[in-house]
Regions:
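Residues at the N-termini of beta-strands
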Residues: 38-39, 97, 207, 240
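Acidic/histidine-rich catalytic cores of soluble enzymes
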Residues: 30-33, 62, 127-235
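Flexible, glycine- and charge-enriched loops at secondary-structure boundaries
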Residues: 25, 76, 80, 115-123, ...
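Active-site-proximal loop/turn and secondary-structure-junction residues that shape catalytic pockets
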Residues: 18-20, 43-45, 65-66, 102-106, ...
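A short helix->loop->beta-strand "cap" motif at the edges of active sites that frequently abuts
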Residues: 57, 95-96, 142, 236-240
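Active-site groove signature of glycoside hydrolases
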Residues: 86, 90-115, 140-152
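Surface-exposed, active-site-proximal loop segments in enzymatic domains
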Residues: 64-81, 104-122
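N-terminal pre-domain/capping segments
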Residues: 1-96, 175-179, 231
């Protein structure tokens, strides 16, 4: 199976970092593939790349950097070097999309260099760095996705975290090799209005990620917010 949704313009992938977590990573990937889904992985530096390539799974998204950030000269150089290494791994895995964040994330998803105030200079530097990332993607035939995060719960101090921020950066670069990874879990926590957000982002979206709020699961259905919007977001994506 290919993860295709009949009658829809999108395919479904499942994240191997979040499922079957009591199992070895390669087994998680195989279980997801056997269930008919495409596969997403995160940090490739801790993975057995050759084993993943031989697994038979279709890996469609992976982290596209190792360290660094978008704004500081040394951080941008690190990010671009890591992006080049990531592209080489993506080619080995035949993975079409590589994921980025507004800054490098460390232990527990916290930014390595927290930023409380993003300046105009930071915005200009971020666009310049992302232009170089997009150029790298164009040369390699891969698309980089810039993901929004939330600062209230999971990633405090992350610059360019809001969906509105990531969308603005993607639109400023204006390259088909840099798209938005619209994470509805993070967007619901940080901004809400998911349907309007999907409509606003439109063609800038390269990927949409879905997890329930709170807690990325459906244990507390009576408190869930994203689950009420998911069907309508899906219908809009299919129609679009």
């Amino acid at each position: 199976m290919t993860g295709a949704v009949p009658g829809a313009g999108y395919r479904l992938a499942a994240c191997a970092e979040m499922l079957f977590v009591d199992r070895p990573f390669l087994e998680r990937v195989r279980r997801i593939a056997d269930a008919g889904f495409l596969v997403e992985i995160w940090d490739w530096t801790s993975k057995d790349i050759e084993a993943l390539a031989a697994s038979g799974a279709t890996i469609v998204s992976m982290t596209g950097y190792v360290t660094g950030n978008l704004t500081q000269p040394d951080g941008a150089a690190q990010l671009l070097a890591g992006a080049a290494r990531s592209v080489a791994v993506a080619e080995r895995l035949n993975c079409p999309a590589l994921n980025l964040h507004g800054t490098g994330l460390g232990e527990g998803g916290k930014p390595v260099r927290p930023v409380e105030v993003v300046t105009g200079t930071d915005w200009v530097a971020a666009v310049r760095t992302l232009e170089r990332v997009a150029a790298l993607g164009e040369r390699a035939g891969r698309v980089f996705h810039l993901e929004n995060l939330n600062t209230a719960v999971d990633h405090p101090g992350t610059p360019f975290a809001r969906a509105a921020d990531t969308l603005a950066l993607v639109e400023a670069v204006g390259s088909p090799f840099l798209r938005m990874n619209l994470d509805l879990y993070h967007a619901q926590i940080g901004e809400g209005n998911l349907i309007e957000l999907v409509q606003r982002a439109g063609d800038a979206i390269g990927e949409i990620q879905v997890a329930d709020v709170p807690g990325r699961c459906e244990r507390a259905r009576e408190r869930s917010t994203t689950r009420r919007s998911r069907p309508r977001c899906g219908r809009w994506a299919t129609a679009g």
